[in-house]
Amino acid sequence: PLLLSSAASDVYKRQDDGWSWRTSSLTKFTVVDVSNRSEPDVQRELFIEGAYITAREVNGTVRTVTHASMNIPDVKTWLDLPAGYWNLNYDDPLRLEIREKVAFQTMMENTESIDALELSDLIPQVYEYSDGEVSVHTMSDNDCAEFVAPESSLNRGISSIFTLGLTASALEYDVDHIVGNHPLVYASSDLLVLAETAFDAWWFWNNDGADEMTNLHTFDISAPDATLYTGSGRVDGTVLNQFALSEHEGVLRVATTTGQWMRWWMDDAEPMSSQLVTLVPSTDAETGHQVLVEAGRVDGLAPGERIWSVRYDADRAYIVTFEQIDPLWVIDVSNASNPTVLGELKVPGVSTYIHPLSRDHLLTIGLGPANADGTGLDWSATQLSLFDIEDPTDPTQSATLRLSPVESEQRDAWSWSWSEASYESKAFQYWAPKSMLAVPPVSYTHLRAHETS
């Protein structure tokens, strides 16, 4: 079978007094039988409530991750403050009194609305279209055994892992849910990880006490037709993308940056810094819950800089940070309890994607320097860089190539170029047998014409 995915729009549901809006996001899966290539046949069409994040097919089983908001029409996520509130001075005690009174009343009304809901009103649903009819499938048992919610969280969305068998004649699926923010997704051959911010942006704003943290939720996907929740943990900082996560021999490695949102309203906001943390599965002695506990860490990577790219290769991690110049960090993660920095290289520009060519070489794509002294970033061109890491304690940059085919020396011309491969790994195609790299460049040149008399 062939699986096609696409997006659909708003869903409404009928109530006694008419129609009401249910959700704005649907992910559609179409299962197509292509055994007869001249006459492909649509076997099944499924619509899952939630926005599509990613999917992977292994041996006839597809796992897809979606994220849906809890859309509750009668619940207010704002305060209906009276007009007089806005006329008061910011530090007027009456202003705070009005706000607290309205907030309390809103919470009471929201509680009544939530208490009146059925479970099916909250959780995502699956719709199957077949023979002109639409049937609804549940994504939960009544005991909510397939749900996990962080103990300290202000999140209002549901991330769902939908495990679908493609070869079965009848619809067969398994589903797991995390109550949380929109996640990043990482998967190895045996482990799937959802990484989501532990704070809600609305409440994090102007909140001096909220820490930048990331929740990590892990699932065993070693069995072809099942997804099993195996535990959760939390690390400080925020995760850049899926390449900042890696599982190797049962150890989860995570690279994060703290302080990058710069709480400008604070006099002593924490400085920006990056770290690498290793975690291993364990069981909480008090609750019996499956958890991820910290095994080791490397702190203080490039104070004042944030992470721009990460890549793991077995027992090594490569991290690029940047403020005015690009340090490449080589870290030994062979010992989970004692990850160690092996080497560091400061070079102009920055790498946004790292591709290990071999144990001794890295190929990266990113931006070159803007200034003659090697500082800043030249956003008008894409740069490829080759690094020699044969000696991990002394990495070197062996070559660079600036991709800007539209450069002009004409005085009144300016140009820029970029490549999708600088932020989308699927656009970075390296073919090892021929040592060939293919990246899609986009370029633009503006020439100003002058009239002469």
PLM feature spans:
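Beta-sheet-rich non-transmembrane sensory/scaffold domains
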Residues: 1, 6-448, 453
